[in-house]
Regions:
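Oxyanion-binding/catalytic loops of NTP- or PPi-dependent enzymes
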Residues: 1-181
């Protein structure tokens, strides 16, 4: 990677990953960090992105950042969207006798609506509707989902994320009560 920077005429001193940059920004802007002679403030950063989840544990004192552990898994928001898509595609296949995944336009419409539904569920535990007009062959389709069903669909991905969190906690040798809240 540094080779390409040198080709561009840039002198790169060091590269850092996303979570280290996040921790560094936290340490720079936090004014209430403990003095160097006091016990460190331990913070865990979790970034659940579109394609994966990153977790990092760091300890802070004024002017000092120590990265304790970091981890990554390939479970993110995209996986959640795909699980919802599969669920509704199966439901629409049974109810309306259509194969959603044979039609790219219909698949994209369904995925777009699933993303919207996921965002609504972040703030709502009630049963929420999904309605798509002129979905396939000019048919309107509808369904619904609540957060409990959503969590059931993504349970495997949540387990992957939990495993990364546990692995980071184990590697950092931190206990839950030692983490700053």
């Amino acid at each position: 990677m540094t080779y390409f920077y040198r080709m561009a005429g840039l002198n790169v001193l060091k590269l850092m990953n996303d979570t280290t940059a996040t921790a560094l920004a936290y340490g720079i802007y936090k004014q209430d960090l403990p003095e160097p002679d006091k016990p460190s403030r331990n913070v865990v950063f979790v970034d659940c992105g579109h394609t994966g989840t990153q977790v990092a544990a760091a300890s802070f004192n004024k002017g000092k950042l120590t990265m304790l552990a970091s981890g990554y898994c390939n479970s993110g928001g995209r996986n959640f969207d795909e699980e919802m898509c599969k669920h509704f595609a199966e439901e629409f296949s049974q109810r309306f006798k259509m194969n959603v995944f044979e039609n790219k336009k219909a698949t994209l419409k369904l995925l777009t609506e699933c993303v919207k539904l996921k965002k609504l569920m972040a703030a709502n535990t009630n049963r929420l509707p999904i309605n798509i007009e002129c979905f396939m062959d000019d048919k309107d389709v509808s369904g619904h989902m609540d957060r409990a069903k959503f969590e059931e669909l993504i349970a495997g991905h949540l387990a992957d994320i939990e495993k990364v969190m546990v692995d980071v906690m184990t590697a950092s040798k931190l206990k839950n009560e030692e983490i700053y809240r």
